[in-house]
Amino acid sequence: MAIEKEGAAQVAVIGLPNAGKSQLVASITNASPTVAEYPFTTHNATPGMMEFENIQIQLIDTPPLAPPSIEWWLRHMLIRADALLIVVDLNEAPLTQMEGITAQLEKTRIVIDERKAEESGTILYQKKALIIGSKLDLNNASENYPALKNNYEEQLPVMAISAKEGIGLEELKREIYQMLDIIRVYTKTPRQKPDFNDPIILKRGSTLEDAAAAVHKDFAQKLKYARIWGSGKHDGLMAKRNHILKDGDVIELHL
């Protein structure tokens, strides 16, 4: 099954059975996946929209990863997603869970370790990812978390939450946004205030020319000059087409 991308980005939430994926998605989006204490309650992919400040990011609760392999349609979904949230239960041998998850991903040529992608001589799909230790409020979670963090923090961001108790969820939203490497840019017309409710979403490192093309496919070619507020030397001065934009910049395009 294919789920059309909505919002600023699409993030697939993955994990082993009963890791806490559905509880997490239910807690930070408008989705209502089935949440239960027993495994394999998620049979289909369920999308939901997560609000972060003035944008929305689509999260997809996916069926649990279970041996021997990832189903073809789920593999396709993970490849299409902009990033992955990897959820592991901190009370159930989180390091073993991570080993199982990465092994299943690598069988389908999906890697989350940049070093493996660089070393491989075959075509791999490298994905941005964030590791989430779930169920922080239970039993041995706080004791198991340091080992998870120490083993993976050089590769990927790692954090601990309790979706049920609401612990760490606001921080998680910000981590998701930062992981995506996107920026928000706002447009304005001369002598008018910018609309801060409808940003252009661009990849980090994008230029004024990229922003013009995002507004309309013809604008990049027709662009004569632009004024910028934010990352320019002085607010409102003209900037070159190759000026690299930063999160929160306001631009005024002149065609």
Annotate each PLM feature:
Residues M50-I57, W72-A160:
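Conserved C-terminal guanine-recognition region of P-loop GTPase G domains, centered on the G4
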Residues T29, P33-A36, N44, G48-F52, ...:
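Signal for well-folded cores of large energy- and translation-related assemblies
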Residues M1-A9, I14, A19, D113-L255:
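C-terminal-of-GTPase-core extension/linker across diverse P-loop GTPases
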Residues M1-L95:
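Conserved G1/Walker A P-loop phosphate-binding module
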